C-alpha cells in the first residue's frame, strides 16, 4: 500500500490541503490512489468522478473549478497552524508513521503539537474505556498506565473523562510519555481537561488529530 503514496500530489502541501478542504479523507485517498496528476484532478468531469465512485458529484466538480478559493483557504490554515505551533504531516512526508500507512483508511494528514518523536516510538499501548467508569476502574487504569509508562511505553488515549483521563494521569504521575488523540486540535473535550492537555505538553507528551483544526 505504501507504493501508492507517491506521485504528483506529494510535492505541494498547500495544494494537497486544498483538496482535503474539498474532499473528505476517504475521497482524497481515492484521488491519491488513482495516480492522477494535478491537472487531471482539476479537470475531473462528472463521468470521471462517477468512475471513481464519488457521490455529490456536482458539488465536487464545481469546487474543483474554484480551486483558487481553496488554495487561499489552505494557505490561511497553514499560516495559522504555524503561528500556533501545530505541525502538519502528510502521508507523503518522512515523519508520517509507517504503521499508520498500512491501516485500511489512513489519514492523509495528521496534526500534532508537542513531542513529535513520539510518532516514531516503538513501544506504545492504548487505553480505551468508558467515560463513566467506577472508582475501581479509574484506579486500575491509572496504576496500569503508570506501570507501563515507567517501562518506557508511550501511553495513548483520547483525553476524555473516565478511563482516558486516568490513563494520561497515570503516565504523567511517573513522568512518563503520553499521547492524546483528539477530534481536532481545537476540540479538547471536556473543557475541564484543558489543564491536563497543557500538562501533557509540558511533560514532553503529544497532542494529535487527523482532522483540520
Q: Language-model segments: what does each one mean?
A:
Residues 1-94:
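Short, small/acidic-rich helices and loops at N termini and domain boundaries
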Residues 2-9, 88-213:
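Glycine-biased, small-residue-rich flexible motifs in mid-sequence functional cores and linkers
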Amino acid at each position: 500500500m505504501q507504493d501508492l503514496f507517491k506521485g504528483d500530489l506529494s510535492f505541494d502541501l498547500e495544494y494537497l490541503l486544498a483538496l482535503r478542504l474539498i474532499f473528505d479523507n476517504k475521497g482524497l485517498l481515492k484521488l491519491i490512489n488513482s495516480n492522477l496528476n494535478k491537472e487531471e484532478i482539476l479537470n475531473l468531469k462528472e463521468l470521471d468522478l462517477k468512475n471513481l465512485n464519488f457521490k455529490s458529484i456536482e458539488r465536487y466538480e464545481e469546487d474543483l473549478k474554484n480551486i483558487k478559493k481553496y488554495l487561499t483557504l489552505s494557505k490561511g490554515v497553514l499560516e495559522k497552524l504555524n503561528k500556533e505551533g501545530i505541525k502538519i504531516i502528510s502521508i507523503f512526508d518522512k515523519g508520517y508513521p509507517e504503521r499508520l500507512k498500512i491501516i485500511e483508511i489512513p489519514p492523509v494528514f495528521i496534526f500534532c503539537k508537542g513531542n513529535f518523536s513520539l510518532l516514531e516510538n516503538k513501544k506504545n499501548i492504548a487505553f480505551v474505556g468508558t467515560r463513566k467508569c467506577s472508582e475501581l476502574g479509574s484506579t486500575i487504569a491509572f496504576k496500569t498506565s503508570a506501570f507501563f509508562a515507567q517501562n518506557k511505553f508511550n501511553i495513548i488515549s483520547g483525553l476524555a473523562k473516565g478511563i482516558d483521563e486516568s490513563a494520561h494521569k497515570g503516565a504523567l504521575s511517573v513522568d512518563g510519555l503520553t499521547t492524546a488523540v483528539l477530534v481536532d486540535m481545537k476540540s479538547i473535550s471536556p473543557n475541564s481537561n484543558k489543564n491536563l492537555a497543557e500538562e501533557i505538553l509540558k511533560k514532553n507528551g503529544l497532542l494529535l488529530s487527523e482532522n483540520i483544526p
